[in-house]
Amino acid sequence: PQRREVSADDVRLLVPMSRAGIVFDLGNALAERNLNRALALLDQLLFQGETAIGILIVAIIPTVRNLLLAKDLMTRHRLQRPAQPFFFGKTLERIPAEATAHLPRKKDGTVNTYSLGIAAIHAHRYELSELRAGLEACLAANIQLVTTQLDHEVVLSQLIVRIVAKREG
């Protein structure tokens, strides 16, 4: 029997992605806590010649940082999870300016609310302590990548597992 529906997995399989698209998808897989997808995207990026340090700095660290910032703001100010990423900007406008002074900015000086909005949608998947530990694990991985001869794929794979895998208890 032939099926007529096309799934997202079918499209992923058939449509080649740009490196930028894979980097974006890796961030989304981390935010969604989708370990298998995150590891598959890491393999794809490394296969395409991306450097491990580049993947860490462009995809992994910003995702973990934004999840931590969004989770912290949502916890402190009892903010609701946005239905869409761009809704989070309006939510941030309602809290005191000093509460958002530390947030990452775009070149024009405004808060990058879209990336924080994506993080806010997925922040419920993590505890604050997990995200703090994840950011510390990013630092440790950065140090390992630049100061040791450890296999870069192993360093990043272990980092992704540390970030994404659910803690027992």
Language-model region placement:
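C-terminal alpha-helical interaction modules of replication/initiation AAA+ assemblies
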Residues: 2-10, 22-25, 29, 35-169
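Short helix-capping and inter-helix turn/linker motifs at the boundaries of alpha-helical repeat units
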Residues: 13-18
